[in-house]
């Protein structure tokens, strides 16, 4: 296959590892491991120095056209399309800002710092939630009301804007890392330290177990309807079916995009059953579920794909890797 980046895309030399890529309107923001944010919009290409150290996480601001980034400098920065960068929460902590999630539906922003989730409403810190151990991951539901946090021994669900909410505990022994909520908040899924997923169906708290991965899952992506959950951590994407009351229990996953390289990133198209898959060797593919038709977005490079993001209209996809190679491909 000829890589689509050469036919209908553009290559970018990012200059540092890509922490994440996010589309905000027509602008693509690459958050980088050296503290910079690179903004590409048409012919415009702007670089902002948002942090003094590495950017560890990023999410679009829920109320403005800008990107929120968390760094190892303990700060949260807001970078606009113009390249202007300002403090959203300066010197928030001496600890790293490991996780950031936000919701345009509710306006809430949540930052994971050590054992605390710090909640912002309209840009103002309102309260903090404590957890029994360091937070492994944060996730909000589609309405931005429920906040899931993973930690040692399970996960906890809270109403994000209810400062006195004691939370719903979802126990399961072991270390829980990344976490995701299904679009309708019926399922909470965590990545475990031992190369497996654990999940709970709500409100019954029914336990789900999904194992057999050769590596840890670090990337999740739900399709728009919440019928499929794509995951990384194998030599294909592992896509679990969540239609029906029992979710994936007793059902085999789909395994699109089989290659001799670990999948490191997955991203569903915003409206169709089309999955973008990034690999440890730097390659990226597109697979359509209806006929398993594949398209090579980019060829292998020198580093694992760490960033995959669709534009809202599903016509462009951004790719970034840990070696500093980036691309925007029209599909």
PLM regions with names:
Residues 1-331:
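WD40-repeat beta-propeller superdomains and closely related acidic/aromatic-rich repeat-like regions
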């Amino acid at each position: 296959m000829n890589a689509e980046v050469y036919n209908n895309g553009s290559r970018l030399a990012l200059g540092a590892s890509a922490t994440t890529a996010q589309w905000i309107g027509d602008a693509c923001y690459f958050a980088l491991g050296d503290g910079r944010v690179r903004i590409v919009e048409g012919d415009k290409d702007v670089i902002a120095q948002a942090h003094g150290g590495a950017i560890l996480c990023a999410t679009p601001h829920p109320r403005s056209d800008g990107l929120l980034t968390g760094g190892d400098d303990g700060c949260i920065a807001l970078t606009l399309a113009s390249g202007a960068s300002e403090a959203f929460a300066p010197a928030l902590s001496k600890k790293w800002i490991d996780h950031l999630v936000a919701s345009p539906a509710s306006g809430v922003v949540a930052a994971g710092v050590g054992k605390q989730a710090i909640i912002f409403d309209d840009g103002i810190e309102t309260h903090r939630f404590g957890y029994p151990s360091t937070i492994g991951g944060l996730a909000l539901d589609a309405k931005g009301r429920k906040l899931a946090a993973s930690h040692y021994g399970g996960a906890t669900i809270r109403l994000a804007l209810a400062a006195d909410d004691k939370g719903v505990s979802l126990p399961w022994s072991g270390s829980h890392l990344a976490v995701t909520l299904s679009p309708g908040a019926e399922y909470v899924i965590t990545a475990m330290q031992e190369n497996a997923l654990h999940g709970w169906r709500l409100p019954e708290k029914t336990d789900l177990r999904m194992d057999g991965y050769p590596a840890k899952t670090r990337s999740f992506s739900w399709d728009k309807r919440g019928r499929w959950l794509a995951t990384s951590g194998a030599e294909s994407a592992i896509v679990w079916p969540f239609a029906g009351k029992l979710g994936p229990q007793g059902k085999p996953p789909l395994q699109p995009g089989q290659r001799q390289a670990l999948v490191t990133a997955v991203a569903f198209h915003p409206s169709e059953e089309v999955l973008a898959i990034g690999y440890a060797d730097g390659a990226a593919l597109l697979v359509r579920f209806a006929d398993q038709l594949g398209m090579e977005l980019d060829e292998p490079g020198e580093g694992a794909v760490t960033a995959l993001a669709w534009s809202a209209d599903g016509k462009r996809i951004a790719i970034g890797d840990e070696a500093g190679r980036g691309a925007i491909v029209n599909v």
